[in-house]
Amino acid sequence: MAAAAGDRASSSGFPGAAAASPEAGGGGGGGGALQGSGAPAAGAAGLLREPGSAGRERADWRRRQLRKVRSVELDQLPEQPLFLAAASPPCPSTSPSPEPADAAAGASRFQPAAGPPPPGAASRCGSHSAELAAARDSGARSPAGAEPPSAAAPSGREMENKETLKGLHKMEDRPEERMIREKLKATCMPAWKHEWLERRNRRGPVVVKPIPIKGDGSEVNNLAAEPQGEGQAGSAAPAPKGRRSPSPGSSPSGRSVKPESPGVRRKRVSPVPFQSGRITPPRRAPSPDGFSPYSPEETSRRVNKVMRARLYLLQQIGPNSFLIGGDSPDNKYRVFIGPQNCSCGRGAFCIHLLFVMLRVFQLEPSDPMLWRKTLKNFEVESLFQKYHSRRSSRIKAPSRNTIQKFVSRMSNSHTLSSSSTSTSSSENSIKDEEEQMCPICLLGMLDEESLTVCEDGCRNKLHHHCMSIWAEECRRNREPLICPLCRSKWRSHDFYSHELSSPVESPASLRAVQQPSSPQQPVAGSQRRNQESSFNLTHFGTQQIPSAYKDLAEPWIQVFGMELVGCLFSRNWNVREMALRRLSHDVSGALLLANGESTGNSGGGSGGSLSAGAASGSSQPSISGDVVEACCSVLSIVCADPVYKVYVAALKTLRAMLVYTPCHSLAERIKLQRLLRPVVDTILVKCADANSRTSQLSISTVLELCKGQAGELAVGREILKAGSIGVGGVDYVLSCILGNQAESNNWQELLGRLCLIDRLLLEFPAEFYPHIVSTDVSQAEPVEIRYKKLLSLLTFALQSIDNSHSMVGKLSRRIYLSSARMVTAVPAVFSKLVTMLNASGSTHFTRMRRRLMAIADEVEIAEVIQLGVEDTVDGHQDSLQAVAPTSCLENSSLEHTVHREKTGKGLSATRLSASSEDISDRLAGVSVGLPSSTTTEQPKPAVQTKGRPHSQCLNSSPLSHAQLMFPAPSAPCSSAPSVPDISKHRPQAFVPCKIPSASPQTQRKFSLQFQRNCSEHRDSDQLSPVFTQSRPPPSSNIHRPKPSRPVPGSTSKLGDATKSSMTLDLGSASRCDDSFGGGGNSGNAVIPSDETVFTPVEDKCRLDVNTELNSSIEDLLEASMPSSDTTVTFKSEVAVLSPEKAENDDTYKDDVNHNQKCKEKMEAEEEEALAIAMAMSASQDALPIVPQLQVENGEDIIIIQQDTPETLPGHTKAKQPYREDAEWLKGQQIGLGAFSSCYQAQDVGTGTLMAVKQVTYVRNTSSEQEEVVEALREEIRMMGHLNHPNIIRMLGATCEKSNYNLFIEWMAGGSVAHLLSKYGAFKESVVINYTEQLLRGLSYLHENQIIHRDVKGANLLIDSTGQRLRIADFGAAARLASKGTGAGEFQGQLLGTIAFMAPEVLRGQQYGRSCDVWSVGCAIIEMACAKPPWNAEKHSNHLALIFKIASATTAPSIPSHLSPGLRDVAVRCLELQPQDRPPSRELLKHPVFRTTW
């Protein structure tokens, strides 16, 4: 029979069915062995028996099915069915009675599913039992080996359903068999099981908890021995759904399950349906995932990192959220448990989330909840319950508190720490372990650490460092300092000195800094404590100094302390910036104090030596010398910091050091120059920084150093009567540039120096160009020295022309060519440049020489160069020997002039006149005079040059040049008194221009500047600013806007204007004029000539000569001369100008006015639109008056009726009764809340229709009742003061019996939500109208520091016309703590309808006015769709909706049918970040509201 059954299974069409089916897996007696040993023989036997025994087999099959049904109803035998086949003697294949065979077959049906047989099976039975076991092995092996997984999966799914019949065969798809199977399932399975199975099948494979097993594989024996039926056996027996059955050769522990991460335990989720006849519901499944996404090594590394991280638990800011802080008070992160995310934005499993899970919740690293992406509600609740129980257990310790209070009275803090430790050691180990953990950083506390104690409260110990961070958090929130555990007031005031104190207020900290000669520990400790009191670096902790810098930092530590120096090496740039701020404070204070003691000759501890030093005019090397030396060493390192704010802080420290450092002697200057040299070298590298702000600031810093005592970095500038001589100005900077010759492969150093050289030549031309004459002859350097300076810089640039870095080579070539163009006034110098180029052997020699000769052709000195250098050297020497006359300077209207003569071919022919057409053709962009400052720290005089013609773009086309001409008025010699008026506006520097063309912004600025200048100093019809610039050829690569060429008429006016007298320096006939002029005169000459064209430039301007050398070098870095609109300067970033030193920059104002005309026009239109909107809403109907509800001025608006008990003081007693059902009647109910109801009402005396809101204030406890009464009073008084057309108005309020009655005006149209439910979604015009009125009302509320917090359709009421909207229901409204947007007291409160609430409110974060703006966007969606946002009507669980909104990364979907304007308003309102949402007043300026007027 068994053979026949197996035969039928064999013929089913499944591959390997004889082995996979239960009958084939082990039949009765020899039949099973026969089938297990050879499938062909079994198939042959089946074919022989099939025709004659079909009817008998069908009857036997039915009997077996009925027997199985009965076996399900009764508890099955625990042990006998499993081992019946092994214990019974071998029986023949044709057994006379079917029961033993059926029992054996039934037993064999469990074996393939249960996995491999126990190892002791062969020993418990004879040889034939061993054969049966082998047969079963072969039958179980075939599905795993020969059969593919897809074929085995259906069988596994059928056998996995443990609630089905144990002996149910794997039947085929015959109709009658399928029908019987469904009936059996329906009769034997409860309804809840059906549902649970369907859910499990939809969910996919489940994770089964592995059963603990022994090495000998004895768990199968235990399963067989325990009478647990299908519950335990079924968990191990069926293979997981969709997975392959285990191979029998493997150990029992080798079941096919998903690999786990080390140490992660699995929770069993499969239920136990039948256990002792009981049916139990399924257990709740835990959250999915639970596996670490990292390798075991990476997982261990991350866990260890979290356990060492300097993070701090600041507070629980919401139901399921924490605020986590770092060492810096600005680093705060919000961690949300459940969604498992953090505000840091670093993705899943960030260090802050792991900190909460491992240290706050104290999970084990092997806990599966640690690595789950989401947690279920019950898991979150369990974590928080354990957390709160741990915290409360630390607070409730009265006996220990009592003991330690006595101890604290009798001992100092050290004794207190030891006594508390000894007391806690007597308690149980778990609590003791809890007591020894700091509640802020959640790490253990050691006796050697600095600890503090909550003296008035819970008596818990905390780290001193952690408590300082908590104190800073309290200070920033403007809250009193309390214990983070018990919330009691903190007695100690050690943590509240956070304000920065001035040097006068805290001289002790300065003296501590000034004593490096005694580095004993007590001094260092007191020094650090004093520094903490001023700048509070304590919450940054002790930072580790890298080993490579320990030797370098050792002298720093001796001067400034370990804490400050350690913070300079912090990985957090905020910490480094704060450390530099404190360093600046300490250095300036130390230098100021030392200078004050020395200059004042005061006595004291070291007064003798300081006074002696002061008498000799030198600074104190014992005090200020070490401070300056250590500070310069620090700055040479920190100035290389890549963070811009840290770099700015370093430059501020440099300025603070220099302005308080006196320098009186040459020896002090040399020492200061030596100390500053590494700092300047570091800044020079920054001059070529990729960040344009950094490069601009670096160049501006060095330029301030070049200005010497006239700049912001003047030595001893802030010291009264210092008389410092400075560090050398331009000469010192030149020594820094040329002293350390940068290696050719270090392109950053080369490029930084070249960028600075480019600016130096433009900013200080009088320092380098021999032909520029200074007015201050006594302070001016000889022209030979300037000539040597220029040649040294050009030699440096020439060395880098062939540099492999393209930008270095281009900038070098540009500097060389631009300098050559500037020295065309002195042909000898120009010839020297040509000679230097010839000797360089550059690969660019041919091209560079061609350009130099083209420049010579333009100014007509080419023949001089061709005649030879010898003919011009003598003339050049004569030119250098000439002294600028002083008489002409005294009579000149300008401070000095630059003269050049126009030379003929032999330098002998000189023309004294020229036509205006010739002048216009020969105007040059270099003819610009600019102010500067000398090396001797005096401001440089202005410069006058005469125009000269030249081609700016030296390519094949001679017309491809651009000329920039700035005309200016010429003043007669009698106008000399105007000189002080001009010079008084001037800054310290003059900026001649960069050789590439000026940017359009610069041109516009100069245009405005010269318009103003001309209007002040001349008649408006004489001159006009003219830009002369021709377009480049089409082949040029330069794409810049070019102004148009002036007409000849304007140029002739310019020539006429220059006929007045001017002063020229005509020292020698051999000196060349710019382009034309008188050549034979010597000495001073006043030449009123037509051809004399010059350009005096107002002192404050910064010019760009529009000179384009070639397209190949024109595309250079713009960083060397930034545009005026985005320029970053030392003054704007570092220096703080005092009011008396601040200068009025009218040019800047004009430029701003020019740039903002369009913006101001738009803003004016928007303000006008806003004014119209407010005016339209200003008028409203008069509010009906109810006599009994009127109160006099100064009285409380709430009127207490006579029958109300006198338990509510502060209200107005009723002069006339106004009681329900007497003076007013209550109508139908129109609203219902948790503690309030809203009704229609009528005043009996006047017939006025009203809406009355009745709120009961009676609560269970007196404290709760007081809170309710106070909230109601606040709402009523708030509404009593509001008066706006879009805010609901209140007629009055009474207190009667146990209710407050709020009488508000009747809005017959009902709420927006009511209209939407009745009439459907609004048209867009209606939505716009209502939205505008809503924004008007909110703008009024926000201006009165009120946030509504419950804006939704149900709280927006419409009048009887449908045109007026009013905001109602201020039960959730609150007054802001201040006029600021943020209000800390509102965090954690969940008020209002969830679907309309902003995400930050649901997350428990701080919120303000912007939460109402978010609700406006939600109201737009509701009015446009007639349903709330987020599909809220589909969420029956409000917690699920809260989670959805709080964890949303996108705004709710906006209806697609909205117009772009209204859609833009909704998008602006629904910005996820509160700071990105515009205020309601700004939204009223949107064009969508203006188009409807």
Swiss-Prot record:
Its cofactor is Mg(2+). Changing F1396A: Loss of AP-1 and NF-kappa-B transcription factor activity. Reduced ability to activate MAP2K1, MAP2K4, MAP2K7, CHUK and IKBKB. SMART domains: S_TKc. Residues 1-23, 36-46, 140-156, 235-256, 411-428, 512-527 have a biased composition (Low complexity). ATP binds at I1230, G1231, L1232, G1233, A1234, F1235, S1236, S1237, C1238, K1253. It catalyses: L-seryl-[protein] + ATP = O-phospho-L-seryl-[protein] + ADP + H(+); L-threonyl-[protein] + ATP = O-phospho-L-threonyl-[protein] + ADP + H(+). One of its GO terms (molecular function) is protein kinase activity. Residues 157-178 have a biased composition (Basic and acidic residues). Residues 89-99 have a biased composition (Pro residues). The active site is at D1350. A zinc finger (RING-type) spans 438-487. Activated by autophosphorylation on Thr-1381 and Thr-1393 following oligomerization. Keywords: Acetylation, ATP-binding, Kinase, Magnesium, Metal-binding, Nucleotide-binding, Phosphoprotein, Serine/threonine-protein kinase, Transferase, Zinc, Zinc-finger. Highly expressed in the heart and spleen while a lower level expression is seen in the liver. GO terms for cellular component: cytosol; filamentous actin; tight junction. SUPFAM superfamilies: ARM repeat, Protein kinase-like (PK-like), RING/U-box. A zinc finger (SWIM-type) spans 333-361. Belongs to the protein kinase superfamily. STE Ser/Thr protein kinase family. MAP kinase kinase kinase subfamily. Binds both upstream activators and downstream substrates in multimolecular complexes through its N-terminus. Oligomerizes after binding MAP4K2 or TRAF2. Interacts with AXIN1. Interacts (via the kinase catalytic domain) with STK38. Interacts with GRIPAP1. This is Mitogen-activated protein kinase kinase kinase 1. It comes from Mus musculus.
